[in-house]
Structure formats: C-alpha cells, structure tokens
Amino acid sequence: MSPGQKEALPVADRTPPLGVEELHALVAAGDIDTVVLAFPDMQGRLQGKRFAARFFLDEVLEHGTEGCNYLLAVDADMNTVDGYAMSSWDRGYGDFAMRADPATLRRLPWNEGTAMAVADLAWEDGSPVLAAPRQILRRQLERLAGHGYTAQVGTELEFIVFRDTYEHAWDANYRGLTPANQYNVDYSVLGTGRVEPLLRRIRNEMAGAGLTVESAKGECNPGQHEIAFRYDEALVTCDQHAVYKTGAKEIAAQEGMSLTFMAKYNELEGNSCHIHLSLADADGRNAMAEGGGMSDVMRHFLAGQLVALREFSLLYAPHINSYKRFQPGSFAPTAVAWGHDNRTCALRVVGHGRSLRFENRLPGGDVNPYLAVAGLVAAGLHGIEQRLELPEPCPGNAYTADFAHVPTTLREAAELWENSTLAKAAFGDEVVAHYRNMARVELDAFDAAVTDWELRRSFERM
C-alpha cells in the first residue's frame, strides 16, 4: 500500500453473478432455457413468473412484464382483503409493471437450465410503487447516500431441518415431524455431520447463484442450523437473502426433506435472523470506526436505533409468531438496550477497526429483510440528523436490568408503528398505512382462528 493510499473496507465482489451478454451466450448455446423474474412481496417472499429465456431477452428485459397489483394487497394465504389504498375490488385489481434489475441476474443451479432476475415495481406512468419492499429500501438508501454513506449489511438466517417432505408436513398439520437432529448440536461437528449432505448442497448451489458462502454451524433447537454468507451492500444482501431463503426450501424439497424459517416453531429456541450493519464513506472506509473505537457517526446512528426500535418493531418482527421469540434467557432480546458484545441486548456492538459494526438481534427468520434494513437505515439517519446522544451501554444482563421493553405482541407493535411520527416522516403516510393494514389483516385472522391450545383446554373440561 503506497503512502497516503486509503485502506479499503473489505466487501464482497459486486460484479453481477451473470451479465446480460453472458446470458445471451448461454441461451444461444442451449444452457439456459428459463428465466425467473420475481419481486419480494410484503412478507419478503419472491413472487413472479417463469419465462422462456429467449422471450425474456427479446421482450421482458427491456420492456418488463405485468403482475396483478393484488400481490401487494393480500394476506399470507393469498386471499384478497380490504383496507389497502393501492389495490382493491373498487379499484379493479389492475396491474403494475415488473421491471428486471439487470444487476441481479444469476443462475439458479437447483433449477436446471434456469436463470433469475429480481424486479422493481412501477405503475403505468413509470412512477415507483411506494409500498413495494424493494422500493422502500431504495428510498432509505438514497437518503443515506445523500449523507455520503453506503450501508454494508449481513443477515444470519437460522432454520430447522426436518426429515419429512413438505407434503407430509402439510398433511400432518405441521405436528409430529422428525427433526434432522435429536438434540442440541450448537457448534457440534459430529451433530452437523448428519445433515451435511443437505447443508453442503445448499452452500455449493448458493455459491453457484453468486452468493459468497462463509460457513455453516449447528444451533440449539433439534435440527436447527445456520449458513452464513459474506456481507455486501444493503440491496445486494437483501436480494441474496430472498434468493437463498427460497432456494434452500426448494433444495430441501428436492432432497425429500423440509425446513422452516418461522420465528418460533415450538417452545424451544426460535429461528433468529440477526442483521449486521456498518457504514462505508465515499473512500470505502468504515465510517463507524475512529481512533480505536466508535466514531461520532456510529454513536449517533446507534442512538437512533434505540429511539426508533419500539416504533419500528413491526419492520423487524412482522408476524404474530415473531413475538414468541422474545423470552428472557432465550438469546432473543427483550430489552431496548445496547452493549459491547452483549447478546442479552437488542443491539450488540461487535468487531474492531474496519470490522466494527452493530447487530440488531430482534429479527427472526420470518423477517422481510428489505423492510428491516430500511428500518435500520431510517432509524440511524434520524440519529445522525438529530445528533442524538448515545446512552451508556448495558454492562451485564439486560434481561433483568431496567430498560424499556421490546413490544411483546404484534398488536402492540402495530399500534406503535401506526402512531409513530418518526415512521411517517421517514417512510411517508402511504407506507405506514399499508403495513399497518398488513398487521391488522393478520391480527383479524388470528383472532378468528380456533387454536390447538383452545381445543386441548376446552374440548372436555369446559
């Protein structure tokens, strides 16, 4: 390194996994015959179409395709529901345009002869669909860029593997399934070896899809595992997260197995999705590090996280099941607190120098990464713009200390979100109303459901 040369912040290769010209060549050679074009919906699931590869190149890549706008206005079961301003029976359930982002082209090794691109959504006049998760994140990243920073993000998804097919799991009402491990295999090389054929295939095929694989390890709940990927720019990471989550399920199904990312499958440890974030400045340096510690930028950014955390919890924990993770002593947070390498806090500061970053420990495996990262960026920008002071860290057990509490139910989180002036200022009234309605729809469905717990409690004895 020559004198005066900047030390670059290490990031993953940003070269698109598959270029347009390379795709043309693969299609001409007959190696690719199908292209998936998909966008993340409100739950972070990929929705879209499969195209003949030649038609995709000749028509769709330049002009886009259409999709019914109800795809951002349905419940998790794809039922039409009331309350969304952008899409309804009264508005005729028209279309929006799905426009491929060429930078997201990649092969899908688990689907023979298949490539994929992620789409952005636009209305007929070309204006973006504001409630689309990818657009929500783009808007916050543009705001961050206005301050001279880019967000570097990594997500850590946990999942539980079962030796049952998805079809059997459905028929069994998702009860009585056989986990791939019989006991806690956290960090166990022996225990994870039993699931290694599946985990190895997932790792290798994700690498073939352009993701940079780091490692895999066992977790605490029987059958629970985690595969880690290298961090990257925020939008790239969120796209990769969505591809990985879908692809892992497809690969498991092909192997006659199933896996779940739901936040709390049973009364044991839940599936987390800790999100790590750092900021890079225009020179590629870690803007959060200064003089062997945290910079003022990081302190303000982290202070913003604390101020907004309760009001933005809907973005980090979007479902009823999400809130069942938040139990004392569970490694899932209950306290709105931060600490140095302290896993009892909602916000954990880790790393040193150029690797210095913070981790938000609220999200579970059911998180929509686009919305969660948008929330992290918006909260941090509030801290920077208001120059918020960071309180002292929690030095011990945040579970038993006197801190504000993470919301304990989706209902509480939805009310905080709906009444948040900070959320409305950062995201706009349309987005706040849209995702408040998403929570209302889920709450109404749950309130009307008769649960197994009620049957066991009341069938004979009441």
UniProtKB/Swiss-Prot annotation:
Description of how activity is regulated: Very slightly decreased activity with glutamine synthetase (GS) inhibitor methionine sulfoximine (MSO).
Listed GO biological process terms: ethanolamine catabolic process; glutamate metabolic process; glutamine biosynthetic process; response to carbon starvation; response to nitrate starvation
Keywords: ATP-binding, Ligase, Magnesium, Metal-binding, Nucleotide-binding
Cysteine pairings via disulfide bonds: none
UniProt biotechnology annotation: Modifying the binding affinity of this protein via protein engineering could make it prefer ethylamine as a substrate instead of ethanolamine, resulting in efficacious and sustainable synthesis of theanine, a major aromatic compound of tea, highly valued for its beneficial properties.
Pathways involved: Amine and polyamine degradation; ethanolamine degradation
Classification via Pfam families: Gln-synt_C
InterPro entries from the UniProt entry: Gln_synt_N, Gln_synt_N_sf, Gln_synth/guanido_kin_cat_dom, Gln_synth_cat_dom
Sites where the protein binds Mg(2+) 2: E158, E219, E226
Keyword Nucleotide-binding: yes
UniProt EC number: 6.3.1.-
Binding site residues for ATP: E214, H276, L277, S278, R343, R348
Function: Involved in the catabolism of monoamine ethanolamine. Catalyzes the ATP-dependent gamma-glutamylation of ethanolamine. No activity with polyamines. No complementation of the L-glutamine auxotrophy of an E.coli glnA mutant. Enables survival of S.coelicolor under high local environmental ethanolamine conditions. May play a role during starvation conditions to limit intracellular ethanolamine concentration, which in excess is toxic to the cells.
Entry's family note: Belongs to the glutamine synthetase family.
UniProt cross-references to PANTHER family, sorted A to Z: GAMMA-GLUTAMYLPUTRESCINE SYNTHETASE (PTHR43785), TYPE-1 GLUTAMINE SYNTHETASE 2 (PTHR43785:SF12)
Protein name: Gamma-glutamylethanolamide synthetase GlnA4
